[in-house]
A protein has these predicted regions:
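Helix-start/capping segments and mature chain N-termini
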Residues: 1-108, 130, 137-342
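Extended, Lys/Arg-enriched charged tracts that mediate electrostatic binding to polyanionic substrates
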Residues: 117-128, 132
Length: 342
C-alpha cells in the first residue's frame, strides 16, 4: 500500500496517485450487477470493445473534502449522477441509476479515506467515474454491456498557478465540439478534440485555449476543459450554447452570485465583449475557479486586458471563497449541496 508519510499535501499536483481501492459496476443481460471492490488498476477489455472503436466512453469529475470538523463532504454528487446519465443517453449508452452512483461514490471515498487531504491543505480527493462500452462491436452500433469504474486520487490545483491570474489564447482553427454534436455531454472525444489547441496555447506561454462557438466563430464557448464567465459591474455573465457542457461548478457559482446580490446572465457572449469585462475566470470541478487577467486573440493580435495589475478581482475572489467555504463546511450549506460520507 502507498506510504503517506512523505506526502506534501499542500503541494500536490493535479495528477494520478495510486490509492488503495476502486469500485466497479457492470451492466449485462439487461441489468446492473452488484458493486465490486478491487485493488486492480487495470481493465481487461475485449479488443473489439465499443469504447475502443466507436467512442462509447463518458466520464465525470467530483471531489471529496475533509472539513475542520473532521467530516467528509461530497459536493453535489447527485448532479454528477444526472449529468453522467444525460451523457449516456446522448451516445446511446446505458444510464447508471443515481442511487448506484451515489453508493459507489460513498464507498470508494470511505475505502480510500486515508488519502483525503487534511483540512487547510488546499487539496482534495478527486473522484473520476468513467463508463465504457465493453461489448465487442465491429459494425457501428451501441454496445449492450457497460462498465462503470470510480477511482480516486488526491489532487492539488488543476493549474500550477493556483488561485492567481493566468492568460489564455484564442485560436480559430480549432473546435472542441460540433454545433449539434457531443459538446453538451461529457464525452472523452471532446477533450481529445481540444488537445491540439491546449498544447499550442501552453507552448506559447498561456494556461489554456479559449474556444469560440463552432458555427460562427463569434461567441465564447469553453475555456480549456472548463466553463467560462465574466463579470461586468455587478453582473455575472456566462456563455450559453448547445455545444457547452453544463458545468456543476458554474451552476453553483451562478447561485452564489445571486446570494451575493449579483445579477446573472446566461447568453451568447461575443468575443469583443471581453473589452467590457471587469473580471473573468474559467470554472469547473478540477479548476474550481481560475481567474484570467488577459485573453489574446492570436489570429488578430488583439489583447483583451481584463486585469491591468494582474491581480484577482473582488467579485471572482468572493465567489471562489464562498464556494470553497461551502465545500469545506466553513459556510452554511443553504442550498443542500453537501452530501456527508459517514
Amino acid at each position: 500500500m502507498t506510504n503517506l508519510e512523505n506526502i506534501d499535501w499542500a503541494h500536490l499536483p493535479f495528477g494520478y496517485m495510486k490509492t488503495d481501492y476502486n469500485v466497479r459496476c457492470t451492466f449485462k443481460d439487461g441489468k446492473w450487477g452488484e458493486i465490486e471492490v478491487t485493488q486492480d488498476e487495470t481493465v481487461n477489455l475485449h479488443m473489439a470493445a465499443s469504447c475502443l472503436h466507436y467512442g462509447q466512453e463518458i466520464f465525470e469529475g467530483l471531489k471529496a473534502f475533509r472539513g475542520k470538523d473532521g467530516k467528509i463532504r461530497l459536493f453535489r454528487p447527485e448532479e454528477n449522477a444526472k449529468r453522467l446519465q444525460n451523457s449516456a443517453r446522448g451516445i446511446l449508452m446505458e444510464p447508471l441509476p443515481e442511487d448506484i452512483f451515489l453508493e459507489m461514490c460513498k464507498k470508494v471515498v470511505k475505502l480510500n479515506e486515508r488519502f483525503i487531504p487534511p483540512y487547510g491543505s488546499g487539496s482534495s480527493l478527486y473522484l473520476r467515474p468513467v463508463e465504457i462500452g465493453i461489448a465487442p462491436r465491429v459494425g457501428v452500433s451501441p454496445a449492450d454491456e457497460y462498465m462503470v469504474i470510480i477511482f480516486v486520487t488526491p489532487v492539488g490545483p488543476y493549474f500550477k498557478e493556483g488561485f492567481h491570474c493566468t492568460k489564455v489564447a484564442v485560436f480559430r482553427e480549432y473546435d472542441r465540439a460540433a454545433p449539434c454534436g457531443t459538446g453538451r455531454w461529457k464525452v472523452g472525444g471532446n477533450y481529445a478534440a481540444g488537445m491540439g489547441a491546449t498544447a499550442r496555447a501552453k507552448a506559447a506561454g498561456y494556461s489554456a485555449a479559449l474556444f469560440l462557438d463552432p458555427k460562427e466563430k463569434k461567441y465564447l464557448d469553453e475555456c480549456g476543459p472548463a466553463n467560462f464567465f465574466i463579470v461586468k459591474g455587478n453582473t455575472y455573465i456566462t456563455p450559453k450554447s448547445g455545444s457547452i457542457l453544463p458545468s456543476i461548478t458554474n451552476m453553483s457559482l451562478q447561485q452564489i452570485a445571486r446570494d451575493l446580490g449579483m445579477e446573472v446572465e446566461a447568453r451568447p457572449v461575443p468575443l469583443e465583449e471581453l473589452a467590457e469585462a471587469d473580471e473573468a475566470a474559467e470554472c469547473g470541478t478540477a479548476a474550481v475557479t481560475a481567474p484570467i487577467s488577459e485573453v489574446v486573440d492570436m489570429d488578430k493580435d488583439v489583447h483583451y486586458i481584463i486585469s491591468k495589475d494582474g491581480e484577482v478581482g473582488p467579485k471572482v475572489t468572493a465567489l471562489y471563497n464562498r464556494l470553497r467555504a461551502i465545500q469545506m463546511g466553513d459556510y452554511p450549506d443553504e442550498h443542500g449541496w453537501v452530501v456527508f460520507v459517514d
